[in-house]
């Protein structure tokens, strides 16, 4: 048993977070994201929300300070975003320090980043456009 590590973080996720180097990226995706067809390592976190997992990992995870560390998918033309999704994620990520800005990129650019990601964590999140990419930084 390890102390102070959230029980929401599976042993597999903990191992992946430890193996990532600075500049590596991880995606916390909604339940509908095509993770398995994109290529990188996939970790299942069924039944958990993205915001709960972000809240659990942020004490262990240094965000990049040299490049935008947070990326979300922009709405497809003609579609809308629910601003409460980003607000929940920002609240979860600001537990340790102020949350950096979240950059929005189009769907296909996000998929390209996902193909190069270190890992994708599929959650039980059902919010539309509920995917977020985190870029790991250097620990101080």
Swiss-Prot record:
InterPro entries: L-fucose_mutarotase, RbsD-like_sf, RbsD/FucU_mutarotase, RbsD_FucU. GO terms for biological process: fucosylation; L-fucose metabolic process. It comes from the Bacteria. The active site is at 22 (proton donor). Substrate binds at residues 30, 107, 129-131. One of its GO terms (cellular component) is cytoplasm. Keywords: Carbohydrate metabolism, Cytoplasm, Fucose metabolism, Isomerase. Pfam families: RbsD_FucU. Belongs to the RbsD / FucU family. FucU mutarotase subfamily. This is L-fucose mutarotase.
């Amino acid at each position: 048993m390890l102390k102070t590590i959230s029980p929401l973080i599976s042993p597999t996720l903990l191992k992946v977070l430890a193996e990532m180097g600075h500049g590596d990226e991880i995606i916390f995706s909604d339940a509908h994201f095509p993770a398995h067809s994109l290529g990188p390592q996939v970790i299942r976190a069924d039944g958990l929300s993205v915001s709960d997992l972000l809240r659990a990992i942020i004490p262990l995870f240094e965000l990049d300070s040299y490049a935008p560390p947070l990326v979300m998918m922009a709405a497809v033309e003609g579609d809308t975003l629910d601003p409460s999704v980003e607000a929940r994620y920002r609240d979860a990520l600001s537990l340790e320090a102020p949350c950096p800005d979240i950059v929005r990129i189009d769907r296909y650019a996000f998929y390209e980043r996902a193909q190069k990601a270190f890992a994708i964590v599929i959650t039980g999140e059902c919010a539309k456009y509920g995917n977020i990419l985190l870029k790991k930084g250097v620990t101080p």
